[in-house]
Amino acid sequence: NMVPVTLDGAYTDVVQIDVQSILNDPFPPEFRQQAHSTLQAGISIAHVKVTAGTLAAAVRGVKGRPDAGTQYILSNNHVLSNSVSVIASDRAKEGDTITQPGPADIERVLHRGVEPNDLAARLARFIPFDPSRPNKVDAAIATPTRLALDGATIGFEEINYLEGVADPEVGQVVRKSG
């Protein structure tokens, strides 16, 4: 009853799901928030001026682009780019430091501040948020630095590779880590 039938001309449909499965994560938050020797989806990561977020996936530049085949990490724009900051000097720029774990988790779990060896990646590309128009993308990519990039996802037994793009379907199984 809280979501309108249409929103800005688009039909909406809310389907109630069983949320119990999200509570069965065999990896406690403390595990995801600690320092890791490889970059894997599901671990804590963030722009040096952000608190913390989750590394979403290991990705590569696409064919036909100058960066084709280049390895990147992918996460939300607000995690890797700090582009939502209202303070202009705090907004992200390419090459900014991405830490692993994220700065808030470094303090909370490791009980210290950010150090040079926390550098995990450098911000490569993002689409800045523009408050004057709808933002259609909440994603950013960064180039890994000292840490090896692992295609695995914490909490998943197998590595799944993207084979294409498809429209979502009601009842379609999706999984998230972190």
List PLM regions with ranges.
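Autoinhibitory propeptides
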Residues: 1-31
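Serine endopeptidase catalytic core focused on the charge-relay Asp
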Residues: 29-178
